[in-house]
Structures are given as C-alpha cells and as structure tokens.
Amino acid sequence: MLIFVGTLVTLLSVFGGYALEGGHLGALVQPVEILMIAGAGIGAFILGNGVKTIKSTLLVIPTLFKGSKYNKDVYMELMGLLYVLLAKARKEGTLTLESDIEDPHKSPIFSQYPKLLADHHIVEFMTDYLRLMVGGNMNAFEIESLMDEEIETHHVEGEAPALALQKVGDAMPAFGIVAAVMGVVHTMASADQPPAILGEMIAQALVGTFLGILISYGFIGPLSSVAEQRVAEQTKMFQCIKVTILASLNGYAPAIAVEFGRKVLFSTERPSFSELEEHVRRVKAK
C-alpha cells in the first residue's frame, strides 16, 4: 500500500509542479525516449545477471507491492510454535518430535499455525535443525556454526534481486543521457530546420535525461530498498529460530528459550515480556 502512496506522491509532485509552472504535459510524452531508456535498462539487467537472479527478481517484484507478512502477530506465532515443540521434546523426549518434523503439513502442531506453514523456508529451516537436535549427534556449538552459514547463504540469495534492481536503477540516469545525446545528434543533423522545430527537438531530447533520473530515483531505487528490507525481515525470523533452539540445547526451559528469541527481534515488532508470557500461557492452555 505504501508503495502506491509513494508513487502517487512522486508523480503528483513532479508532474503537478511542472503543470503549475505552465508546462505542457504533452511535451513529456516521448514514446521513443521511453523505449530507448527502458530497453537499455532491461538489456543491461539481462546482460548483468544469471538466469537464477533474473527469475528470482521477477518473482520478488510482485510481492513488493503487498504489505510485509512478517509482523508482530507472525513473530508471536513463531515463538508459540517453538514453545510447543520444545515443551513436547522436554516433557515426552526429543524422539516424539520425529512425526512432526518429518511431515509438518500433517502435524497437528504445525497445522495450528497456517501462516508459518505456508512459508516453506521457515518450516524447512526449523525442522532441519530440530531433526539434528533429535539425532543428538551434534553439540550446540556445531549447530550454531551451521546455522550461521545457512543464514548467511539465505541472506546472500535473498539480496540478489535487491542488488540487481539497485544496479539497474543506478544505470537509468546514464541511459537517460544516452537517449538525450541521441536526440541532440538528431537535432544537429536537422540544423536546416526552422528555430521552432529545432527547439521542439531539443526539448524532446532533454526529456530523456529527465525520465532516466525520475525512473531511477523515483521508482527503481525505492523498490530495491523495499526488497532489501523484506530480506532483512525474513532473516530475522531465522535468527529468532536459531537463538531459541540454541537456548534449548544449552538447557534452558522452553519458556526461557523463547524469551531469547524475543530479544533478537526488531523493536517495532518485538512483543513485550508480559505479552509473550501471556501468549505462552494461552498456548499451554490449548
């Protein structure tokens, strides 16, 4: 929603201001300039990225126009799920978790948290390390090291679309200049035309520079920032799972382990101690 608001504010400010000072909006409509700038940007994007990055970027872009799914309620659900699983392991033994982690979609515990179950990255990360915990062949230090490596790998993969968008955005002003120079060349080749026509041709050429800068800093740059923020939010989910499981492996009770997880969350989404305590009580009562 905020993306649409930001886009509307940008367009109204730029084009509205131009119209208020007496400019003719029709002069800014230059399909050929748009074709040159957009085509060069798309070509550079394809040239500078592999198939994997191109696919992931195309998949990420539509999600940017939706609100973030990682909010306070989701984090509360995550800590509630972790508490239930760790409490079951502590009370009935870690081997009792096998049926839940082998097929989470059929697990009566996981099925109570459909939002989390829909995120296969989160479910896979959680079940993989619970499986290692059940196996009992690795200590907490080894599991922590492995978790750090996987989180770093995920972060690098997740950042690829944001970096790809950022590089294209950074290049758009230059492509705008290219389009403008091409327009100036065309104008100079038509030096025998009347001044009125030459003035119109120069104005058309300058639109290229304007569009390149506007597209870069008004649209593509902000989208790359949103993509980067979404990666950071998902990474925070992994970190919450990590510290909670490690706290359990180090002997802390489930209620204390989820408190470890709470402390790593961003302050804007982090529940208070009493909120988490009350949530754990409700989970216990189920």
Q: Which ranges hold each PLM region?
A:
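Large intracellular
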Residues: 20-161, 233-286
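Alpha-helical transmembrane segments of integral membrane proteins
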Residues: 1-9, 32-36
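Helix-termination/interfacial motifs at the ends of transmembrane alpha-helices
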Residues: 5-8, 12-25, 143-146, 150-229
